[in-house]
A protein has these predicted regions:
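Alpha-helical transmembrane segments and terminal signal-anchor/GPI-anchor hydrophobic tails
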Residues: 12-15, 21-28, 148-265, 309-330, ...
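Short hydrophobic/aromatic helix or loop-helix immediately within or flanking a transmembrane segment
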Residues: 12-20, 33-55
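Loop-to-helix entry region of an early transmembrane alpha helix in multi-pass inner-membrane enzymes
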Residues: 41, 53-70
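Transmembrane-helix signature of polytopic, membrane-embedded enzymes
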Residues: 73-93
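Membrane-interface alpha helices of multi-pass inner-membrane proteins
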Residues: 95, 126-150, 246-253
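Short acidic/glycine- and proline-prone juxtamembrane loop motifs at membrane-interface regions
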Residues: 100-106
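Membrane-interface transmembrane helices that cradle and orient dolichyl/undecaprenyl
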Residues: 112-126
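Signature aromatic-anchored transmembrane alpha helix within multi-pass, membrane-resident enzymes
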Residues: 165-169, 282-303
Length: 348
């Protein structure tokens, strides 16, 4: 994906921003670095460094892809036994999304994947240093700062508590979301127009209706299955990731934009899930459930790619999410896909 040409949704926006981004020599001129434009400092510095090398946006894509996938596959090599299964699931389910849709946030996700072992081992100094780096790429990483507080509660739950504790936490946090955003907007997000708009969109968003909640819970069945098995195996680090994934998914049902917090836990979830569904003992006892969970996981991602693209007027009936990836063009066969270009314009 690093060599793609005009493929992806947010990628096209970042390419537009990059066209008028400053290089390093321009960035450090007095008054040139404008934090109010919304991008976090390390992302701005990253763009400037790439701009210093070349004006071609492909350099941003290449570095982004190298860092993100390098971290994901390096950690998979250390953590995952069934690596090929993980690669297949990642490639078909989330590879386009992480590499083209959330370029800034994907770097923060990579930082969290690297830093999670420090959280598990209680090395909070290193963990928080990595969290600061993640936050400097994407503001949503501020959420990672509270994970050490939540770890004792969400890594030891057993039985029905494994499902109840994340629900209670999520409902309490959802109740105070407006208060939390107000504090952030008056401190860390002060004078940042982009983050102010994002906060406003969160508060104005509507949650899922009953049918939406039921559908979302059905799509989370693979997660529930992993939670059930992890309780029996007693691995705290796995149980915490699964509970956090459930926790942010519930918040996302109340405030839809906040469902993106789940991005931080998707890859670690796939690490766990890839080994779990091929464990001989688990297959022997739960093969029908494993098969059902795989089908639901595939369905949930397929439904995402087949849904109409979001616009100011709701979901489009003309353009679908897969239109931003298909057909694929690389820098070696540069071609503008007019349908994709129109679809992206619809979102502005």
């Amino acid at each position: 994906m690093g060599l793609r040409f005009r493929v992806g949704g947010d990628s096209l926006r970042y390419e537009m921003y990059f066209s008028y981004a400053k290089d390093l020599s321009e960035l450090f001129v007095k008054g040139a670095w404008d934090l109010s434009e919304g991008f976090q400092p390390l992302w701005t510095l990253y763009q400037a460094a790439c701009k210093t090398i070349t004006d071609d946006f492909v350099i941003v894509q290449l570095v982004n892809s190298f860092v993100l996938n390098g971290v994901i596959f390096y950690c998979a090599a250390k953590e995952v036994r069934h690596r090929f299964t993980f690669v297949v699931l990642y490639y078909f389910l989330y590879y386009p999304y992480f590499n083209t849709e959330i370029m800034r946030e994907s770097l923060a996700v990579a930082m969290f994947i690297v830093g999670y072992r420090f959280l598990v081992n209680g090395n909070y100094v290193k963990y928080y240093l990595i969290c600061v780096v993640a936050f400097m790429f994407h503001a949503s990483a501020i959420f990672l700062m509270v994970l050490p507080v939540m770890y004792p509660f969400l890594s030891k739950s057993r039985g029905w508590k494994s499902y109840l504790v994340p629900i209670v936490f999520a409902l309490v946090v959802s109740y105070y979301v407006s208060f939390i955003l107000e504090i952030l907007n008056s401190t860390l997000f002060l004078d940042n127009a982009l983050l102010g708009d994002k906060s406003e969109s969160v508060l104005q968003s509507e949650g899922l209706n009953v049918f939406g909640i039921i559908g979302q819970l059905a799509c989370l069945f693979p997660l529930f299955f992993c939670m059930y098995i992890s309780q029996k195996r007693g691995k705290k680090s796995d149980l915490f990731i699964l509970n956090m994934y459930f926790f942010v998914s519930i918040i996302g049902m109340v405030y839809l934009p906040l469902v993106r917090l789940a991005n931080y836990f998707i890859i670690p979830f796939l690490y766990i899930y890839s080994d779990m569904i091929l464990n001989p003992e688990i297959l022997r006892k739960y093969r029908p459930i494993v098969n059902l969970s795989v089908c639901l996981l595939l369905y949930s991602r397929l439904s995402y790619y087949c849904q109409g693209m979001a616009s100011t007027e709701g979901r489009s009936k003309e353009f679908y999410m897969y239109d931003i990836y298909i057909p694929y063009h690389s820098v070696f066969d540069k071609e503008y896909d007019m349908k994709r270009e129109r679809a992206i314009e619809l979102q502005f």
